[in-house]
């Protein structure tokens, strides 16, 4: 079972937007040393929308090779074309990923039946564990609990990243699926409470810059130690909030640059963090113990 703190890894780039393989290697080592339980590569935070197919495969391949089986590697392979999602998922399997994360189709706004058929088709086409990903704030497509329940019985579909931040939604999903279906948080601000309800981990933006704290939080929440988990959560809350002061992954890439872990690169149409946001984020990093 893949569980715990799963970092939604950034994809390092130089100032011209070229992929920085040395920094990627440095980040993977950072997470292996700091107790991250799994790495999610080329997801939303990894700027999958602006990577070409060859870059997408190469990031997965390099992360898988460096991790060398020590922790699971989950590859983002979602697309708003079912055919493309099958291709990306096949590529990820061939590159050695342990599982795939598939966001709901964005922009074309399928019906619930369309979502069921989309994910079922991918699951039947590629034999690899697959995690659904619901984030309607970014996709304009909301997969309802009834659809999740239907999909939870499909072979190869093993869980969902629920990123609405709505704990009632998480409760509804948990109540409608079997106990072996994995429900993960995709919202750092509410992750601790979702895990205390029975969720199996957090696919986290904050873990990029505070991996040890997020690992400890997830471990405490999953063993039912609410007091410890909530105490860590309170310390991380300034960071959880400020890492979304502009669109993700703009702030988290700036924070990692501030920590000396990667250059100042991001791809258009995203732009580097505006100067007015620098000090609020720097202060949140200090409050959360990331900077001294």
From Swiss-Prot:
One of its GO terms (biological process) is lysine biosynthetic process via diaminopimelate. Belongs to the DapA family. Pyruvate binds at residues 45, 203. The record marks 44, 107 as: Part of a proton relay during catalysis. Homodimer. This is 4-hydroxy-tetrahydrodipicolinate synthase. Keywords: Amino-acid biosynthesis, Cytoplasm, Diaminopimelate biosynthesis, Lyase, Lysine biosynthesis, Schiff base. The gene is dapA. It comes from the Bacteria. NCBIfam families: dapA.
């Amino acid at each position: 079972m893949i569980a715990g703190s799963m970092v939604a890894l950034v994809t390092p780039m130089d100032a011209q937007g070229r992929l920085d393989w040395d920094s990627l290697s440095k980040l993977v080592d950072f997470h292996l040393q700091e107790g991250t339980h799994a790495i999610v590569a080329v997801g939303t935070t990894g700027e999958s929308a602006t990577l070409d197919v060859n870059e997408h495969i190469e990031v997965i391949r390099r992360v898988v090779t460096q991790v060398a089986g020590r922790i699971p590697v989950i590859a983002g392979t979602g697309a708003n074309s079912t055919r493309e999602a099958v291709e990306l998922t096949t590529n990820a399997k061939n590159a050695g990923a342990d599982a795939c994360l598939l966001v709901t189709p964005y922009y074309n706004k399928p019906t619930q039946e369309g979502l069921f058929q989309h994910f079922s088709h991918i699951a039947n086409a590629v034999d690899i564990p697959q995690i659904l990903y619901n984030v309607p704030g970014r996709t304009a497509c909301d997969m309802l609990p009834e659809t999740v329940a239907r999909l939870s019985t499909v072979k190869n579909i093993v869980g969902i990243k629920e990123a609405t931040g709505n704990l009632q939604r998480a409760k509804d999903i948990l109540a409608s699926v079997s106990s072996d279906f994995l429900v993960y948080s995709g919202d750092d601000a509410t992750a601790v409470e979702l895990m205390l309800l029975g969720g199996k981990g957090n696919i986290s933006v904050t873990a990029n810059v505070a991996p040890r704290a997020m690992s400890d939080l997830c471990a405490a929440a999953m063993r039912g130690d609410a007091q410890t988990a909530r105490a860590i959560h309170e310390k991380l809350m300034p960071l959880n909030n400020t890492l979304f002061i502009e669109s993700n992954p703009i702030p988290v890439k700036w924070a990692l640059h501030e920590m000396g872990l990667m250059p100042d690169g991001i791809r258009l149409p995203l732009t580097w963090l505006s100067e007015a946001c620098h000090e609020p984020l720097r202060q949140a990093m200090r409050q959360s113990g990331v900077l001294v």
